[in-house]
Amino acid sequence: MSTATGAPNASAAPAPSAAPAPSAAPAPLSTPATTAADAATPASPGTGGGFARRSRALGWRLRFAVLSLIWGFSFLFIKVGTQGFAPLQVTLGRVTFGALVLMVILLVKRERLPRSARTWGHLAVAAFLLNALPFSLFAYSELTIPSTLAGICNATSPLWGMVLSVVALSEDRPTRRRVAGLGIGFLGVLTVLGAWQGFAGTDLTGTAMALGASLSYPIGWIYVRRTLAGASHSHLAMSSTQLLLAAAQLAVVTPLFTTAPTGLPLVPLLAVFALGALGTGFAFLLQYGLVAEVGPTTAQMVTYFVPVIATAAGVALLDENLSWNTPLGALIILAGAALTQSRPRPATTPSPTTIPSSAAQRR
């Protein structure tokens, strides 16, 4: 599933959800199949084949950079959006604009939404856990904490994911490396919050909301993995349905807890539009294009760039203060998250009829 800010998380990779947070793990897509003609045609010698390979490499790296920027700036867009609209209104606009983008693509590709009531029911739960709830919590959190801190809290999703997957997914057993990563990651959280200072200067309510949003993502991923894994519908159809359901949920709740805005301030409105159309809609297409081209392992590395970009954007464009422990803690969190997502390489046993080469022996 992909979240709005998403970045991938290997601990629980279900069928995809609608766009975000940088910590969600996309379900591995099949690499586009090689046709018979492709297989029968050798690569052109000389500069032609090399140029094509370099162009493809540049293409996915450019999309990777754009995806990192979009998701990194999502926290800035949230902060700016809440300066003109209530948090629930920001979230409603976000999922609505994101759903519109995906629906347009769905119509262009002539795909259909799922028809099964069971699928819609499970997607309604996924929409709440992966979109409506975490998006709202992040929006509320940024009323009292800087966007930099929200972006860093988002990077804790892989840590929560490892803890929950051990409990909920019997096939996902912890290793020493992953347990060490979990401990390192939470040490990073304490560093960001300045625990040795008694959390002085930190709004604990806002921080708890941001951490709660990050916790909601792996809960949603695990739910989808247990209920919708193997669904026959395309990622685009499933994600479009999920965002439509999230928009419907928020359309019911938002009027109950907010009053209609007296105006439509331009800058916050543009921020909400960018947050939805780019960070929740267009980013979905980029993410799954990357997964299809370079695989989920490389695509999920975007996770580690999002908090860096979120921090840089908040400091440079919103003039947010940055104490020394914030970037240090962020680096510790990312190191821990990387360890929790690591997998040992499978041992290779040489064929009994093959004498290992010296290079293989050195490895």
Annotate each PLM feature.
Residues 70-78, 103-154, 164, 189-191, ...:
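Specific transmembrane alpha-helical segments of multi-pass solute transporters/efflux pumps
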Residues 89-100, 130, 135-178, 213, ...:
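Specific alpha-helical transmembrane segments that line the substrate/conduction pathway
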Residues 2-10, 29, 33-53, 93-96, ...:
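C-terminal-most transmembrane helix of multi-pass membrane proteins
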Residues 73, 77-80, 84, 99-116, ...:
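Membrane-interface helix-cap regions at the ends of transmembrane helices
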Residues 93, 131, 150-156, 223-247, ...:
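Helix-helix packing/entry segments at the starts of transmembrane helices
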Residues 102, 161-163, 182, 199-257, ...:
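Transmembrane alpha-helical segments that form core, pore/gating elements
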Residues 69-99, 140, 146-152, 219-245:
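Juxtamembrane helix-loop-helix junctions in multi-pass membrane proteins
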